[in-house]
Every structure is written in structure tokens, then in C-alpha cells.
């Protein structure tokens, strides 16, 4: 399978080179993106790209981050947008956005009366609290656990879910407190049912990176342009 990817990639790279010599009239750019992240990132990114390269065919592959890394390692993609950390750290990557986590508190939670005048809270306010978190193999869970390290386990996880959207909806139904990436807090708006607080002096962020199948210096012109667009857009969208 690895060699099949490599042969296909060689053919597409040759097509892209001819495309560059012919004012970008044709070519294929294979982009990987993790589930959910695609709907948040790609619309405005690809709209700008299509304006400049209207005849480049975009082949979008949506899979889990590890699957995308494996495809990159085998040459099956030109680039992928994934969150860190990487399973294959030898792949060239560049962070283009860092998303802070927020404390999501249900509107009717009794502690809201204590916190309601504040915009940011120390993570220590979560001591002894019942929390909703994504499952252990999810990268959002890994980041949440890093944020919670100062508590030394002094909290109780009452519900786990594969989906961060499910966690947000459960928190909005007064099921417990959660830690939510800011971009998802904006994407899955629950109105006034959730109160969000920033975390004081928290160095931990959810890092998003563009990962390449080879040295970024060897990227085709359209690939470089897509990377440039990613670097210039200010997220969260």
C-alpha cells in the first residue's frame, strides 16, 4: 500500500508541476483534516484558496488524526490539519493556531453565584467538582488532564463521551462542569445555559498544526499558498 501511495503521489506531483508551468490550469491537492475540525476550518480557508487557484482540484480526506498521520507517512496526502501531539513526531509540522480551554459551568450550578462576577478563574476552583470530559484517547482529554494536573486528582469524572459536542450539550443540561476548547464553545452555542470562564495563568493550550508529508521547502506552489492562508487567518472563526 505504501508503494501504491508513492506512485500516485509521484504522478500527482508531476501533474502539479505541469500545472504550475501552465498558470495553474489543473492539478490535485490532497488535504487531510480531522473530523469536526474540517467544518470549523475549511470553509473560509478553501474559499480564499479557490479564489486564487480556481482550477486546482481539492481532494479532502476526513479521518482521525492518527489515520491522517499514517497516510502522510506513506505519501497518501500532501498535508493534513491535526491537533498536537503527533503520534509520528518525525513528520514536518508547524503550529498555526493555539486554542485556549475554557471552564464551562451550567447556568444553574450553585457555584455560578460565587463566580458570576468573574471573567477568569484559577483551575483550583474545580477541586472536588463533578466533571464531564471526553474519553481518554481523545486529544481534548489529554489537554484537559494537563490543565487539571495542579488538582492532583481532587475531582470526579462523572461522564465521558467520544464527542466534545455531546459534552457541551450535557453541561448545558446541568449535568456537570467541563473544560472546552474556545473554538467549540463558539461553534456549539448553548445560549445562556452555559457560563464560560477563562483559566487564570494557564500555559496549556490546544495546538493545531499543519503537517506535511515531506520537507515544506519542497511543497508545490498551491500547497505553499494553502499553508500561507492558514497562517494568516485569525481563529477562532
Per-range role (PLM):
Residues 64-77, 82-83, 139-195:
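Hydrophobic hinge/microswitch elements
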Residues 1-26:
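Alpha-helical "hinge/linker" immediately C-terminal to small N-terminal DNA-binding modules
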Residues 88-95, 99, 165-215:
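Beta-alpha-beta core module
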Residues 26-89, 152, 160-161:
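Central regulatory/effector-binding core of bacterial HTH transcription factors
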Residues 21, 44-48, 65-106, 114-115, ...:
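Short beta-strand-centered segments that line the small-molecule binding cleft or hinge
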Residues 28-32, 80, 104, 132, ...:
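Short, well-ordered beta-strand segments
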Residues 111-113, 119-121, 129-151, 219-227, ...:
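Secondary-structure junction motif
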